[in-house]
């Protein structure tokens, strides 16, 4: 009898969680352009049936927003949540108000070429494409630059390269 009661309570909790998830819509404010696009891409990993007004969901949204901004050089955003009542015939709206903060700027790059790599045309050409001083750090561009260095090293037999 006790097991049946526990099963009923558990089922009720699961059903009520799904019902509340269906009644909440997530809205992000304060971003535009590439920042908004990248944050939306991070948030797209969250299924619509997982959207709830609880703190655990807010923490997940907070993490996704931070990851989306970090990739584009914004490491200290401010994120505030506001749960608004539903419009006339709608769902509750969980609003994430985002202020991206100050971006990380590239202060310098230090690429040291040794041996034959110092005069290698492919390396010298690649160095012209490195992230410029004073520009906003873009994690994707930085990783692509590193991959290009590694690719040239492997292709030309420079096996002592390191980062």
Where are these regions (language model features)?
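Hydrophobic h-region of N-terminal signal peptides that target proteins for export
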Residues: 12-21
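Bacterial N-terminal signal peptides that target proteins for export
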Residues: 1-11
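Interaction-mediating elements
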Residues: 21-163
């Amino acid at each position: 009898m006790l097991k049946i009661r526990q099963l009923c309570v558990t089922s009720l909790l699961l059903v009520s969680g799904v019902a509340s998830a269906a009644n909440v819509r997530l809205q992000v404010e304060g971003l535009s352009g590439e920042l908004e696009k990248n944050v939306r891409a991070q948030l797209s990993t969250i299924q619509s049936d997982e959207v709830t007004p609880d703190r655990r969901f807010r923490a997940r949204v907070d993490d996704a927003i931070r990851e989306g901004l970090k990739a584009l050089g914004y490491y200290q955003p401010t994120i505030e949540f506001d749960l608004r009542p539903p419009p006339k015939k709608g769902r509750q709206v969980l609003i994430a108000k985002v202020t991206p903060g100050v971006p990380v700027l590239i202060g310098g790059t230090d690429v040291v070429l040794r041996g034959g790599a110092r005069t290698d045309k492919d390396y010298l050409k690649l160095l012209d494409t490195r992230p410029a001083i004073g520009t906003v750090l873009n994690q994707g561009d930085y990783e692509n630059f590193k991959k290009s260095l590694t690719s040239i090293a492997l292709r030309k037999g420079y096996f002592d390269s390191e980062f």
